[in-house]
Amino acid sequence: MFTGIFKKNINSKTNTVVSTLSLLRNHNLIDKNKRYKIIVNKRIPVFAGLGGGTGNAATIIKYFLKKKLSPKLLDIFENKIGSDLRLFFFNHSFQENLKKIKGFRKKYKFYFLLVYPNIKSSTKEVYSNVKRFNSPLKIDPSKINSKKEYNKFLINEANDLQKIVEKKHKKIKTILNLIRFQKNCLFSRMTGSGSVCYGAFQNRVSANLAMKVIKKKFPDYWCVLTKSI
């Protein structure tokens, strides 16, 4: 059962909650004869690139399996649900490739301004237009020891899918430029295959001021402030 402002965009018969329960039953991990009532307060947009559906799946898996999720089972769930599922089982980490997650040595606090421009971006369509991906990382982020070095690493990173989406939806670039030029914004980028645009800030005050600018310019867009954990 879905509640919340974005519940109308969810298909009640085909979603990650239904898929996850089905997988758990098929692998005899939960009782096939029992039915469960799961309520999801859908407060983030669909087709936003924020991993909301995958996060729901990970939460259900953690609840039923506790700490008994083997690497083999994780591979099975990941193949059916999404390649980003693995990330939800690690804290303060990055995905080096589809199968490898690494953790950072230190935690650094950032504030993120998220803007959803009411664009439903199809992951399948975006990936079908990829000609090539950037070269692998030249440095190992897990060995970063300072905030300055960490900031530099993030700023120099890029989303290979961003230009593809910008080409189709011009306002993505407009929003990202507006965010980037706000005071104390480290960088602005698009999430995954889109379409949420975000900016990273080092303090809440600057992020709040930027949010006011964005809300004034785009009053109909979903716009929220969050922070790293």
Task: Give the predicted meaning of each segment.
Residues 198-200:
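Short hydrophobic/aromatic beta-strand micro-patches
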Residues 1-48, 65-72, 108, 116-119:
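ATP-binding N-lobe of GHMP and related small-molecule kinases
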Residues 36-40, 188, 223:
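Generic structural signal for residues in well-ordered beta-strands
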Residues 12-15, 88-187, 202-215, 219-220, ...:
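Conserved, helical-rich catalytic subdomain that frames metal- and/or nucleotide-binding sites
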Residues 28-37, 63-81, 203-214:
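Phosphate-handling active-site elements
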Residues 48-75, 87:
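DPxDG-like acidic metal-binding loop motif
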